[in-house]
Regions:
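Short, well-ordered alpha-helices that flank and scaffold nucleotide-derived cofactor binding pockets
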Residues: 20, 24, 90-93
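Extreme N-terminal starter segment of soluble prokaryotic enzymes
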Residues: 3-8
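Class I S-adenosyl-L-methionine
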Residues: 11-12, 37-50, 57-134
Length: 134
């Protein structure tokens, strides 16, 4: 099977930067992101080869700890945060791809998903910034 026949879903992909190397290599990359696509109601195609998932990290990020004493910004809404995470996991399990990755900054999401298998900083891969990511 050629790369052009391999579907890569970029769930919550934003600008598509994460999936761009696959696009450059000729894969059929589909960026499933708002406002065009809502991952919570997205129905994936058949024969998905790989999935990159990057659900919103707002409710799980340790960076939000600095707002702990703010009357509104410090409150976490884990139910809302888990909506995208659950949608991504549903698509992953529905598609049963050859590979999949769910990315989120190191933080509180591990309470629901367990210990991460891999952590990194973007600078490990030549990017000019640090963001401890799992």
């Amino acid at each position: 099977m050629e790369n052009k026949d391999k579907i890569i879903l970029d769930l919550c992909g934003g600008t598509g930067a994460w999936s761009d190397p696959y696009k450059q290599a000729g894969y059929d990359v589909r960026n499933i992101t708002l406002p065009e696509f809502d991952v919570r109601i997205y129905i994936p195609p058949d024969n998905v080869y790989g999935i990159l998932a990057a659900p919103d990290c707002t409710e799980f990020s340790l960076a939000k700890n600095g707002w702990a004493h703010h009357p509104t910004r410090g409150k976490r809404d884990f139910v809302k945060g888990m909506e995208e995470v659950n949608a991504c996991l549903r698509i992953i399990f529905q598609c049963s791809p050859i590979f999949w990755v769910l990315e989120n900054p190191v933080g509180l999401l591990s309470r629901w998903l367990g210990k991460t298998k891999y952590t990194f900083h973007p600078w490990f891969f030549g990017e000019p910034w640090s963001k401890f990511t799992a």
